[in-house]
Amino acid sequence: MRSKYAVKPHIKPVYDMLTLLLRPYLWLKYRFRAPKDIPALPDGPIVLLGSHTGNLDFLFALATLRQKRFHAVVAAHFYRNHRIGWLLNLFRCIKKEQFRADVESIARMKNTIEMGESLLIYPEGEVNGTGRTAPFSDSIAKLAKLLKAPLYAVRTHGGYFTRPKWNPVQRRGKVETEFELIATAEEVKSLSMNELYERIEQKLFVDDYAWQKRRMIPFGGKNRAKGLENLLYLCPKCGGELTTRTDGNDIYCAACGNRGTVDEYGFLHPVGEGSVIPEMVPDWVELERDALRREIAKDDFALIAPCHIQYHLDPNTTAHTDVGRGTATLTHTELIYEGTAEGKPIRYAFPLEGIYKFPFNMGNQFDVPNTIRTISIRPENKQINEKFVLALPLIHEYINTKNA
């Protein structure tokens, strides 16, 4: 009897033709070349883990390693559009809910390995917006031990500059990948959970700004700063929040006049005497995290914002629909929405235990992983959206440190 978690094998001619065409397409579009120093692979299935700094990372991964046929683990968000969902099913992708336990997807991953086909997984769970690998859950080590397959890493460089999450408009430069063994099947079994997790962290780490310092490849285009205000909401000079604005290639503070510009290589530079601008986006984000840590350390911490609540109602799009208005409050223990939904008063309280991060659309809304229905919060001030997203992992960090 066929298991309800069974995964269909790839349609080999379709998969092979797709990956064959990928390399010339990616060269023409993004100047991508697959590395030549790919080590020999073992017979049977492997688990390929990828860094996730750009929206197209999976294409570069598939083009890098044509020796295996991969089932990509894809966020359930994309399946909410029926047409995209049909395409993902055609390519035998595995649907997974983001940042919460999903027993069904784990069963499908295990079934894939057992039938002899390989997996492509991005442990970060979503594209990070900084070009530097974001922390991810240690559950990936537990999953690797469950799957019992050789573990490899594919690191993508340049994908962040090509299509940054804060302004996903194509900027042609160059994309490169690296491929490396993380652990053999025997090592996956013998290493402790912590040892395996630390090895995964080390092999997956990517810093596109450090790579760019070495390569200095221009990623041209107009309005290079557009959208950065939704990520970099805190002024590094005066400490004002939600005061940053962008204009063309410049980012500035509407409160104190602090100003910087983004060059063709993606680096930031101060403009004018006295301006304080970090050279790299992830360093600016670290300033925001440090400020948030100080807020979260207070016993009465609460992040509050007027907002709209959204449900997913249209099966022909991944976008959500406003269905009410109220207030979102994030505390040490829960996210609360209080207001209206579909014309009726409502109160949702989501415990933070079990929610590692909020999936988000930068400058728009963040999703709330839960078992009730697809729910999103769209703050009225779009810049504070990023503060909610950054706060959740830091709350977990604070609680874990406090309880240690």
Predicted features along the sequence, with ranges:
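Short, Lys/Arg-enriched, disordered terminal segments
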Residues: 1-10, 401-404
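Soluble catalytic domains of membrane acyltransferases
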Residues: 5, 10-15, 24-198, 214, ...
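Short hydrophobic/aromatic-rich beta-strand segments that constitute the beta-sheet cores
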Residues: 72, 262, 335-339, 368
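A broadly conserved sequence feature marking short terminus-proximal activation segments
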Residues: 174-234, 241, 373-389
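Cys/His-rich short segments
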Residues: 220-274
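Anionic N-terminal interaction surfaces
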Residues: 270-327
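Phosphoinositide-binding peripheral membrane targeting modules
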Residues: 311-365, 375-382
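Canonical pleckstrin homology
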Residues: 358-404
